[in-house]
Amino acid sequence: MKKLFAILFVLSSVISVKAAKVDTVSTYSASMKKNIKAVVITPDVVNSPEKLPVLYLLHGYSGNQSDWISKVKTVADYADQYKMIIVCPDGNFSSWYFDSPVDKSWKYETYVSNELPAWIDSHYKTINTASGRAITGLSMGGHGALYLAFKHQDIFGAAGSMSGGVDLRPFPLNWELSKRLGSYAEFPERWDNNSVINLTHLLTAKSLPLIIDCGSEDFFYQVNVKLHNKLLETNIPHDFISRKGAHNWEYWSNAIGYQVLFFSRFFKAN
């Protein structure tokens, strides 16, 4: 009899465990005239009438919408734990999340900062204001998250970066940046204007809660330290995390937990 009760207890515990729902959806970009996939992770709050905050989670160079959910299994757990929707859009192989001045068909700033949030808000029960939206990402996506949040503070209320390429100029021959911006030698002003480190003038002390994380062995470490120091010099509050680690999924699998906790606190405060 005791064994039976034990089995029933275990079964009831398993059944009662909540599980986030992971869907791959097809969104539409009017500016690029094409469908774009996104992974949407919704917490198990089906019967709840409350609207939910949304975290936009961006992938890096050469990645796609499935990177985060396939390589970091805890991402879905975070949606349940913190009762938030997590959206991982396809930012293409090398969009860098801006509207390219070279190829007008690449409008990923417009897509992620405008078209995608509008689509998500129309299909899910969301808090459809900046106080209910945050954005972060890794590498190219870390650049993209800060870049978009700095420029679109009416859309995103908080932002983060993990191993972000926050200054593009030291890397003129890398990651197809010249295809998106033109060569650095010919168009230095484009590289200046699209580097996160040059957009801090858009911030005030109260504009955006920020969390920036980069490993000390990362090739983006020095540009992240420079951004951190610039934010300190201009009295912009932010969390800056640095620990031993490189530009890899081992580092990001750990970093994402700090990011989600940071945004959960932001959502609760608002």
Model-found features: residue ranges?
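Sec-dependent N-terminal signal peptides
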Residues: 4-14
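Non-catalytic cap/lid and distal C-terminal segments of serine-dependent acyl enzymes
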Residues: 19-270
